[in-house]
């Protein structure tokens, strides 16, 4: 090969590689374009974690996360494909492009931020005090003289200990099942537990008329987006912001959690 031809080959190779990288970048940013082109979005949701996601008596998925997924699809004007995931495979579903979004009680932490991106928060995930609607309970002071069931060593146990008055009779149980059983059977008047446990308990025991009473600790949920997909993330953030402003997200949280969304981080 002549020396004169080598610079031209080098330039051609450089241009080719640049085109490849630009194509890859365009592909990485095209998730929203793909959704709009096919008029359908694939969203991963939980089906084993009430009240955020579970299978109803009609065998259809329902819950806060499911309703949020449907809200996003409706705002985009596209059909929706719901894909059930577990805690273990929800992030890999984003990484392998099996889902455009993951709406599955995702908390944000540094390790997850290395591999996926997050939208603004869309709902709270919390530990709280629950009791029948007929129980007068508006402040921690109202726990005085009441029996309160809690799972030993759980986050709600630690948070309850911080606020419970000395006269509250706190009864600790070894696991969530025992705590719930004690409350349902009337051994305790009040229960301190996580939103998911409470949601499942309320769904199974509607006759108790249980409702949210006091917040112990709040940990918001975020929607997962593939790493670097800023276009889709920005669009979903627009939808979340509008839904928060209109009260739609508060309505979803009241429906499934018994409380409004409250202050959520952007």
Where are these regions (language model features)?
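Ligand-binding clefts/hinges and TM-proximal coupling segments of bilobed small-molecule sensing domains
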Residues: 29-30, 155-172, 210-212, 241-266
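Extracytoplasmic small-molecule ligand-binding "clamshell" domains
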Residues: 29-105, 246
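Ligand-binding cleft/hinge of the Venus flytrap
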Residues: 55-57, 69-78, 156-172, 202-206, ...
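Extended ligand-binding regions for polar small-molecule ligands
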Residues: 66-75, 141, 146-147, 152-155, ...
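Acidic, polar ligand-binding/catalytic clefts
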Residues: 70, 74, 79-142, 209-210, ...
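A ligand-binding cleft/hinge motif common to bilobed small-molecule-binding domains
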Residues: 89-92, 106-114, 159-162, 184, ...
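Periplasmic-binding protein-like
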Residues: 123-131, 199-241, 259-266
